[in-house]
């Protein structure tokens, strides 16, 4: 059956066959054609032909491409003869969204043949889409000359350039948008099929469904929307989100904060903090929209609100009516655009990247030095000092002291690699001079803390249960000592972020928590929520929990417990796995964030998709921006669920270790020596009065 129905005209014209030449209309051969052709230059008959093709499921996509190219002005003049003119456009169908099975149609040429009628308007004769190996085309009969007085029916025909089978293969309207093997889908991209269900539109993708619910919350979709099968809807980044995130971070990095003087709490001194607060700012923007920012939240000459709105995802579809309707709804809702833009940036800001360099360095240092010590140097040194047939129990303390020396070097170098991994995950620059003091301190702690465990390797308790309990405690202590560079790093990030948030509120960058709110508790909660999802700190904390579990394997497999592995094998395990456990755990957790097991644990992408759903659902329920707020705890639960066992274990370990590290300095301060730490010098009480002296003039 002919897919195009006849079009009625007021004159009589014979049907045009496939091989019949088209007669020139007017001075066609001498006509100077424009370099580009636009919709305004088409005849009414051409528009009608495209509309009728758009209503046909088989050719809807090609007609849509022609209309889009006309509107964008991408059709360029190619050639002309005595009968028609040819225009061509390059169509780059997204390689990661195969709207027409683009495994064969990635690089496409779209050509249109047209002829100029007596009204100086162009009638479309045919259109062709040429891919790398296949082509799709349709022919439209030439409309009659404008003069004449009879009427007849034009015989319109359509043919598929290669074969009708191509229509089934290349334009399968029931297939979902496929992912190109050569291009990874952006993490914040959401694609779903759309179909009509009674008077509403529904989708198989939860995020797309939430978007449809918002768009039709107060009015129905046009009847033309999704009127055919195979309609797809896509949310994808509007701009270069990585670059936008760098702009956002740069604008809201707090370089100095006004803190209490160590000598006099009533005095304020400017202190370098270089605090990164972009994650808590983005969280607050998702929670409160534009109300999250104060009057001085600027990125260059633009407000933070306008900047985030420009980062909101764009909506595309192979149904122009559908995409136009939804985009119009989104553009009219500034608050929703701000929240969606903030979520786009947050998704990228919390993305965890695999750090191969740091992992290779850690394994290399630990394996080479550790194996050299465990499998050779240790025995040679001890034999040289105590003789070949010495009794280990007789020299337990001396032997333990010797075994405690290598960690000073090995763990110092390993901590350098671990801290470099954390900095890399955070996207921060680092230098050897910055990390070396921290690494040497961690190496010294590891050397001291490993001593009790080393003693028990040579002299244990008579009771097997007591010996196992003692070994378990000292092994965990040794694990914590080996990872002692992580807790101070997390604490430093926490203190700097608190100071940065305090100063941003004081400077009118971030909105004040509100009258009656406890500003200290608010800032502490914001900091905790941000660090729970920050790529560096959150992974570091979880790695402590993972290391505390995996690090017990050598003890469990030894002859002190199950005896599953020989001492020789355990030595190799300790050198290759136990020593670099923090670096291995950090990268394993980064990769684990990409794994999604429904009902068990969610990937990072799944968590952020749930946030987008919540934002859209709240907008659907409350069309007024002021009623859409998402509570801080609700958002935190979506991004850092309570079910994250390793986070809870790691947090307990990190907090406990930091408390033990702080015990002696706190005692010294009580005796009147030393300066209070940064966290204790933040004057939260100052937020009760706006600091107008530091705010720029309007």
From Swiss-Prot:
Sorted alphabetically, the Gene Ontology BP terms of this entry are: symbiont-mediated perturbation of host programmed cell death
State its role: Effector protein involved in non-host recognition.
Q: Where is this region: Disordered?
A: 1-36, 171-200
Where located? Answer: Secreted
Bias-annotated ranges (Low complexity): 172-181
Any Gene Ontology CC annotation? extracellular region
Mind giving the lineage of the organism this protein is from? Bacteria, Pseudomonadati, Pseudomonadota, Gammaproteobacteria, Pseudomonadales
Protein name, entry field: Effector protein AvrPphDPgy
Principal subcellular localisation of the protein: secreted
Q: Which UniProt keywords apply?
A: Hypersensitive response elicitation, Secreted, Virulence
Q: Supply the NCBIfam families for this chain.
A: XopB
Ranges of compositional bias, category Polar residues: 1-15
């Amino acid at each position: 059956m002919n897919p195009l129905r006849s079009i009625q005209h007021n004159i009589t014209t014979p049907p045009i066959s496939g091989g019949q030449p088209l007669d020139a209309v007017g001075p066609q051969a001498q006509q100077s054609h424009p370099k580009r052709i636009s919709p305004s230059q088409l005849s009414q008959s051409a528009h009608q032909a495209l509309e009728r093709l758009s209503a046909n499921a088989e050719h809807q996509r090609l007609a849509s491409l022609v209309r889009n190219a006309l509107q964008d002005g991408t059709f360029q003049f190619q050639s002309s003869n005595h009968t028609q003119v040819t225009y061509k456009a390059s169509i780059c169908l997204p390689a990661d969204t195969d709207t027409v099975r683009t495994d064969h149609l990635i690089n496409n040429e779209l050509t249109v043949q047209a002829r100029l009628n007596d009204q100086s308007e162009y009638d479309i004769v045919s259109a062709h889409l040429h891919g790398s190996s296949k082509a799709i085309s349709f022919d439209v009969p030439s409309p009659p000359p404008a003069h004449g007085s009879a009427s007849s029916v034009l015989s319109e025909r359509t043919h598929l350039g290669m074969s009708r089978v191509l229509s089934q293969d290349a334009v399968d309207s029931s297939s979902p948008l496929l992912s190109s093997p050569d291009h990874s889908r952006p993490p914040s991209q959401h694609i779903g099929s759309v179909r009509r269900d009674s008077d509403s539109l529904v989708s198989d993708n939860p995020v797309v469904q939430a978007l449809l619910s918002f768009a039709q919350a107060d009015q129905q979709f046009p009847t033309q929307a999704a009127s055919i099968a195979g309609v797809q809807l896509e949310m994808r980044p509007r701009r270069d989100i990585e670059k936008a995130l760098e702009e956002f971070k740069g604008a809201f990095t707090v370089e100095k904060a006004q803190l209490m003087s160590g000598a006099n709490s009533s005095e304020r001194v400017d202190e370098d903090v270089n605090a990164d607060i972009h994650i808590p700012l983005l969280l607050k923007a998702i929670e409160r929209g534009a109300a999250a920012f104060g009057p001085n939240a600027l990125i260059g000459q633009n407000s933070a609100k306008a900047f985030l709105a420009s980062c909101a995802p764009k909506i595309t579809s192979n149904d122009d009516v559908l995409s136009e309707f939804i985009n119009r709804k989104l553009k009219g809702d500034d608050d929703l655009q701000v929240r969606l833009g903030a979520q786009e940036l947050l998704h990228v800001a919390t993305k965890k990247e695999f750090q191969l360099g740091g992992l290779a360095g850690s394994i290399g240092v630990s394996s080479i030095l550790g194996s050299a010590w465990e499998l050779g140097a240790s025995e040679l040194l001890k034999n040289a000092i105590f003789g070949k047939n010495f009794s280990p129990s007789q020299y337990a303390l001396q032997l333990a002291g010797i075994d405690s020396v290598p960690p000073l070097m090995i763990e110092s170098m390993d901590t350098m690699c671990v801290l470099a991994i954390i900095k890399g995950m955070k996207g921060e620059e680092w230098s050897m001079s910055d990390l070396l003091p921290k690494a040497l301190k961690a190496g010294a702690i590891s050397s001291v803390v490993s001593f009790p465990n080393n003693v028990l390797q040579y002299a244990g308790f008579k009771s097997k249960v007591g010996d196992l309990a003692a070994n378990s405690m000292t092994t965990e202590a040794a694990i914590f000592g080996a990872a002692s560079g992580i807790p101070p790093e997390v604490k430093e990030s926490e203190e700097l972020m608190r100071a940065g948030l305090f100063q941003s509120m004081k400077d009118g960058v971030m909105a004040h928590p509100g009258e009656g709110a406890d500003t200290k508790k608010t800032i502490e909660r914001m900091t905790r929520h941000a660090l729970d999802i920050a790529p560096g700190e959150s992974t570091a904390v979880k790695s402590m929990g993972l290391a505390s579990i995996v690090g017990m394997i050598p003890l469990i497999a030894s002859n002190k417990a199950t005896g599953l592995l020989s001492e020789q094998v355990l030595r190799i395990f300790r050198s290759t796995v136990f020593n670099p456990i923090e670096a291995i755990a950090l990268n394993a957790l980064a990769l684990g964030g990409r794994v999604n097991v429904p009902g068990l644990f969610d990937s990072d992408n799944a968590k952020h998709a749930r946030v987008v759903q919540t934002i859209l659902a709240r907008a659907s329920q409350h069309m007024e921006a002021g009623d859409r707020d998402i509570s801080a705890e609700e958002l935190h639960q979506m991004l850092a669920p309570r079910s994250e066992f390793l986070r809870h274990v790691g947090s307990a370990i990190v907090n406990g270790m930091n408390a033990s590290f702080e015990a002696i300095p706190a005692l010294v301060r009580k005796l009147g020596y030393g300066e209070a730490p940064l966290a204790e010098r933040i004057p939260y009480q100052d937020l009760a009065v706006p600091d107008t002296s530091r705010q720029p003039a309007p």
